[in-house]
Curated annotation (Swiss-Prot):
Keyword terms, alphabetized: Disulfide bond, Ion channel impairing toxin, Knottin, Secreted, Signal, Toxin
Name of the protein in its database record: U11-theraphotoxin-Hhn1k
Function in brief: Probable ion channel inhibitor.
Any single Pfam family the record assigns to this protein: Toxin_22
Cellular localisation: Secreted
Length: 113
């Protein structure tokens, strides 16, 4: 009976000491995995940030191309009423007070220079 107790006590002590070592080892492994996970998350975050910056650059480039290619405001042709303060006559035309026709309208018209 005494040998059974000693054997049981020996097995118990070995199990506790090895279990404690495994617990410390597991803690170290978990800490390493957590650090690796953080580095992986940092890497993924940087990669996502680069992709977003590339996408933003493309969008801004498209906006600048669109504004460059956008149609200008339409201009007013010959004999069309215009505003003397904001003449939008086409190039080669000027906003003048009418000479003969259109005197009764009391407005300005686009005429050739």
């Amino acid at each position: 009976m005494n040998t059974v107790r000693v054997t049981f006590l020996l097995v118990f002590v070995l199990a506790v000491s090895l279990g404690q070592a495994d617990k410390d080892e597991n803690r170290m492994e978990m800490q390493e995995k957590t650090e690796q996970g953080k580095s992986y998350l940092d890497f993924a975050e940087n990669l996502l940030l680069q992709k977003l910056e590339e996408l933003e650059a493309k969008l801004l480039e498209e906006d600048s191309e669109e504004s460059r290619n956008s149609r200008q405001k339409r201009c007013i042709g010959e004999g069309v009423p215009c505003d003397e303060n904001d003449p939008r006559c086409c190039s080669g035309f000027v906003c003048l007070k009418p000479t003969l026709h259109g005197i009764w309208y009391k407005s300005y018209y686009c005429y050739k220079k």
